[in-house]
Amino acid sequence: MKTPLLALALWSLLLQLGLTFWPSSVSQNCHNGSYEISVLMMNNSAFPESLDNLKAVVNEGVNIVRQRLLEAGLTVTVNATFVYSEGVIYKSSDCRSSTCEGLDLLRTISSEKRMGCVLLGPSCTYSTFQMYLDTDLNYPMISAGSFGLSCDYKETLTRLMSPARKLMYFLVDFWKVNNFPFKPFSWNTAYVFKNSTESEDCFWYLNALEAGVSYFSQKLSFKEMLRGNEEFQNILMDQNRKSNVIIMCGAPETVHTLKGGRAVAEDTVIILVDLFNDHYFMDNVTAPDYMKNVLVLTLPPENSVSNSSFSKDLSLVKNDFTLAYMNGVLLFGHMLKIFLEKREDVTTSKFAHAFRNITFEGHMGPVTLDNCGDIDNTMFLLYTSVDTSKYKVLLTYDTRKNYTNPVDKSPTFIWKNHKLPNDIPGRGPQILMIAVFTLTGTIVLLLLIALLVLRKYKREYALRQKKWSHIPPENIFPLESNETNHVSLKIDDDRRRDTIQRLRQCKYDKKRVILKDLKHNDGNFTEKQKIELNKLLQIDYYNLTKFYGTVKLDSMIFGVIEYCERGSLREVLNDTISYPDGTFMDWEFKISVLYDIAKGMSYLHSSKTEVHGRLKSTNCVVDSRMVVKITDFGCNSILAPKKDLWTAPEHLRRASVSQKGDVYSYGIIAQEIILRRETFYTLSCRDQKEKIFRVENSNGVKPFRPDLFLETAEEKELEVYLLVKNCWEEDPEKRPDFKKIENTLAKIFGLFHDQKNESYMDTLIRRLQLYSRNLEHLVEERTQLYKAERDRADRLNFMLLPRLVVKSLKEKGIVEPELYEEVTIYFSDIVGFTTICKYSTPMEVVDMLNDIYKSFDHILDHHDVYKVETIGDAYMVASGLPKRNGNRHAIDIAKMALDILSFMGTFELEHLPGLPIWIRIGIHSGPCAAGVVGIKMPRYCLFGDTVNTASRMESTGLPLRIHVSGSTIAILKRTECQFLYEVRGETYLKGRGTETTYWLTGVKDQEYNLPTPPTAENQQRLQAEFVDMIASSLQKRQASGIKNRKPTRVASYKKGTLEYLQLNTTDNESTHF
């Protein structure tokens, strides 16, 4: 047994992986006058027709469609393609194993690209639901079956056999009826019999009635499932049974088998659901005795009429399953005809969603579909006449109008007085009971009058004994300065919000409390308001915040309320850092939060306060133990209700409060918790005022509500999703109360720990353990972020100051100036920089300097030098400080200067094409002092005659030349590197007199592509020559149409921001050392 199941599971997984993106790759065979129907021929069907018969029915339907289109003047081709399952894995006749088969058929269509205009089938609920769950099915699907609730509200699914939803609506309506001559009592209880031998339709009908969150279950005060024949037979004569009504599904033979000739209590009513059986309408059919206390719910033959007498020639040509396949083909033909006549495309989404709210001509007559694509029809409730032993129509139910019409107002029932009994045993209109009730009523009336008088006396006495008084202001203490509001793990903590919150927090009776503004000026409360405040004082429940009283501060009245450390539930949902989804806010925790709110509201509704009136996620707070508590309840006569996203639609239209309105608000909060999105999240609308307007003015069967994606919900989530949707029903009477919500969530919550009940302490300890583990994870994560930010700050500091200087500043707070015996200093500037600026915009100048200096910085990375600063077009570099390197300082500066000069020979300005950029370079070696100057924006500066001499060497040099002093040449001669240089001659240096200087031209055995210096020796001739070059470059730019760079606040916008300001420019920090 395990091997087939394992193979089936693996096959299902492979199919799901293969079908994830199926719809986008399938091409429809639905164009150019040729239209196909894809029929899924599934072996795994529990319905009473062979595949050969179904194929014949579909082909007959296609012929009818062709004839109808031809009569309408539409010459097109309509065909049906039949897709069969292959292999031996699908041989079971059980619909429960049809999941993989349906996906396999879709895979076949996908791989062979045979998708038609519409899918016909499958019929099994399991298969249909899985296809919609695992694929993005954007094509219309017509099903002869798919009865389950899980297939409700699918946008492209059409069902041509009555689904379970229609059955539930009838039962709820019939249970409510109490004004028919034969049914004077409304029913609120039922037993539901279910075993493992039901047909496919019965299985899903009874499954819907069993579901705890279904519409039927919500309306009953008692419902119990009977499983197995023994339980059914025991309940028939059980004097202690809780209901007289038993619902079952099957045929008359099923009733006979279960009863087995046993006696049945006279007030027992069996409701037999047998929708697709025409046995009851056949001629000469006599109802057996065991059917006399049975009411049969069925569908009439397609050609019958709605009255109590049956024609003798009524019979069904085909069974309902075959007829549904035939009508499915005719439905497609009807829609195809409409679209072709309008000349609209049938491959669009509009066609897929068009199978709604229509009536078409079926094989046996008109067929009507509702707004969900489900078939509408008229159900018959039959009874057995004790006079004629014939089946007769008791009433009819129109599923489209939800209307029950009594047909036989004087039925000849087997039950007493020809009336249906009460659903609760022992209740009925007996004369003795009437007398007892009359006497009891008189006594109760007298007692009621006495109680009213006593209650009024007690209330007046209580007000006299405890007149409302405020808490003395001197008992309210402000928070101390070292007390914080909350613990936050966010690095960018919002201090402004913290200040606002502190204004509302105080201490009372050594406890931290919140002051709630009651919008009351003088504090002279009315008697009604005092009663409300007294009720609040009496509430003490662990899921409700404690109310301590009121206090008057600064001519304002505040309510003093218990403080919860973690803030509102809305803040917790927004804080994805402290409460992440993956490790903390999981599905179990969300269920526990919903359970906490439900318990608090259930207690509040059963208390004297009775209603909240302002329930929303900001009025649900979380304490230090991760327990959710409800606050801001009561005081409805003091604080007027407001219109917001949590307000029920009936209260938006007319301002008031109610318990059912609280249930609606709970549903909105639940959607916030489940999706962890903003309040009333929906993709179709973002504006808050528009949302409120659409909720208030919504009408029809599908009112405006937030998004809750049932299609993608997991199996464990589906029951909660349905519960939430029931909470925001438009009709308040259809919403469950909080007691039922609490019980449903208690059952779901217990399943997480394989237990039905968990103590409060167990829940509390488990939550704190979960939060502790999450806190450890967050602390570790924040520590890593802190270290990363610290390293980032260090890298930035190392770019601004030398590493040794930064460490000294961090450790000692000061940097001692230091004298260096011998260093080499480099200066350079741009020749004609002012002239270039004259013909350039400011942003072009910035771009030019950025392009040049970032290239210089890259060159510095390959030498042991330290960039001191840049001022305008001047560029200063030193070697031998702050880290001493022997005689290497002169070598590194000399090679760096050669690399820079070589680069300038290839550099070209973007906004002045063809213009060479000339630089002058000066180098000098000698002693130097260095230190940090200033407190704000500290700079590492160099001092001494060596700095001035190096500057003079640059200023007295010539374009595209490296001007070197004699001291530097002397050092280079002492090294192993054989530098090439030329004697310039005697040069006058301001402050030093005349000295012999040199031109550095290269290194032996190394090639440097140095640019050729300009030939002019006269400075004025050089300047004139340079101006001519600029003019020529401007003419060239104008002729070639080169545009200036777009002005921007960030230079080099097209290439990125200034690279020497970025921290991650290079991992090589040798630039500075």
From Swiss-Prot:
Chief place of localization: membrane
Segments traversing the membrane: 434-454
Glycosylation sites: 32, 43, 79, 195, 284, 307, 402
Location of the Protein kinase domain: 489-749
Subcellular locations according to the entry: Cell membrane; Endoplasmic reticulum membrane
First and last residue of the signal peptide: 1-23
SUPFAM superfamilies recorded: Nucleotide cyclase, Periplasmic binding protein-like I, Protein kinase-like (PK-like)
One Pfam assignment: Guanylate_cyc
Known EC number: 4.6.1.2
GO annotation, cellular component aspect: endoplasmic reticulum membrane; plasma membrane
Purpose: Guanylyl cyclase that catalyzes synthesis of cyclic GMP (cGMP) from GTP.
Similarity comment text for this entry: Belongs to the adenylyl cyclase class-4/guanylyl cyclase family.
Listed name of the protein: Guanylyl cyclase C
Organism of derivation: Sus scrofa
